């Protein structure tokens, strides 16, 4: 065999094991995207806490999650839509933008990706953790991974916080992925960054009470890891132990995302004109005019970040 000829059995062994099953591909994409979210976001929190706030501050933490979300969606978006959040997935299913049979696949991948991301982060910062607490795992270092409320916050206040913050998140996501709205099909490439900026805005405005988890996988996956990795059952309660906290960043975001999805459709989504024969879509900041016959059809075959059901594969 000539030296320039390649043996098919030795070329790209990983590629030869490619998965054609849609559910496997969705799982892998959501797993990796959520993993990226955790290592960037919680990694920024780790630097802040382990350096005793000398290296970074609260704003840096928000930027870390902004970048984690953006890169996570960039990575997973072309395959799964880049939900990275069980509450978002559930809300999409409620408004028929994600098939219900896919919801368990999305959620399993998201929770597992968050758990594995926490494990890798702990391995990277193991020496720094030990230097910080001498092996005495406390809620302070558990805060690297999951959210904990301020001492003054009641469970009712925490639940309201999570419902409202996730409501804003879901409305923003729907606005950014609605091709009839401002972003449109030509701005699709910017959606991951815009979703990251949306999370940044929520963090700056609503991060004081409990750190704005707004994502059950981002919160409970790492929380479960800490319970298994030496922090114990204290991670399921608020710092004083007066009530169980763990369920609030799970229930609140799910409820808030559903309300946000329904609210967006009620105020915006259901009211686009169906017939566009004599209606022009024009950006206020652009002289370009696009004339369409049906506002409910994409301007061209395209992929929509986040909304799995809106994705159309080009050929």
Curated annotation (Swiss-Prot):
UniProt xrefs under InterPro entries: Aquaporin-like, MIP, MIP/Aquaporin, MIP_CS
Domain of life: Eukaryota
Keyword Membrane found: yes
Upregulating conditions: Transcript abundance is medium and expression levels are not significantly affected by desiccation or rehydratation.
Cited PROSITE patterns: MIP (PS00221)
SUPFAM superfamilies: Aquaporin-like (SSF81338)
Keywords: Cell membrane, Glycoprotein, Membrane, Repeat, Stress response, Transmembrane, Transmembrane helix, Transport
Residue ranges annotated as motif NPA 2: 215-217
Positions annotated as glycosylated: 136
Motif range (NPA 1): 85-87
Transmembrane annotation, as ranges: 31-51, 58-78, 105-125, 157-177, 189-209, 248-268
GO cellular component, one term: basolateral plasma membrane
Topological category with respect to the lipid bilayer: Multi-pass membrane protein
One Pfam family this sequence matches: MIP
Disulphide bonds in the chain: none
Gene3D superfamilies xrefs: Glycerol uptake facilitator protein
Entry GO MF terms: glycerol channel activity; urea transmembrane transporter activity; water channel activity
Keyword Repeat: yes
UniProt similarity note: Belongs to the MIP/aquaporin (TC 1.A.8) family.
UniProt function note: Aquaglyceroporin that may modulate the water content and osmolytes during anhydrobiosis.
Comment block on domains: Aquaporins contain two tandem repeats each containing three membrane-spanning domains and a pore-forming loop with the signature motif Asn-Pro-Ala (NPA).
Protein name, entry field: Aquaporin-7
The organism's taxonomic lineage, starting at the top: Eukaryota, Metazoa, Ecdysozoa, Tardigrada, Eutardigrada
């Amino acid at each position: 065999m000539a030296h320039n000829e390649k043996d098919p059995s030795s070329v790209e062994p990983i590629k030869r094991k490619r998965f054609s099953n849609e559910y496997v591909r969705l799982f892998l994409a959501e797993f990796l995207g959520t993993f990226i979210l955790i290592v960037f976001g919680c990694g920024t929190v780790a630097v802040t806490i382990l350096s005793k706030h000398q290296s970074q501050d609260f704003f840096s933490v928000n930027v870390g999650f902004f970048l984690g979300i953006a890169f996570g969606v960039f990575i997973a978006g072309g395959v799964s839509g880049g939900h990275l959040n069980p509450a978002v997935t559930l809300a999409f299913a409620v408004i028929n933008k994600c098939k219900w049979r896919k919801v368990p696949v999305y959620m399993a991948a998201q929770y597992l990706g968050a758990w594995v991301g926490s494990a890798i982060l702990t391995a990277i910062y193991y020496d720094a953790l030990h230097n910080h607490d001498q092996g005495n795992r406390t809620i302070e270092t558990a805060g690297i991974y999951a959210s904990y409320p301020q001492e003054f916050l009641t469970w009712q206040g925490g639940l309201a916080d999570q419902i409202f913050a996730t409501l804003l998140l879901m409305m923003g996501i729907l606005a950014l992925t609605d091709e009839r709205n401002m972003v449109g099909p030509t701005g699709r490439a910017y959606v991951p960054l815009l979703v990251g900026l949306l999370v940044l805005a929520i963090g700056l405005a609503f991060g004081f009470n409990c750190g704005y988890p707004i994502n059950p996988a981002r919160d409970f996956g790492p929380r479960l890891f800490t319970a298994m990795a030496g922090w114990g059952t204290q991670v399921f309660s608020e710092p004083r132990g007066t009530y169980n906290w763990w369920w609030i960043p799970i229930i609140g975001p799910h409820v808030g995302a559903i309300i946000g999805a329904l609210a967006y459709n009620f105020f915006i989504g259901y009211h686009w004109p169906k017939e566009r024969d004599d209606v022009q879509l024009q950006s206020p900041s652009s002289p370009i005019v696009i004339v369409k016959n049906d506002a409910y059809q994409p301007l061209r075959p395209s992929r929509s970040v986040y909304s799995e059901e809106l994705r159309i594969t080009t050929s």
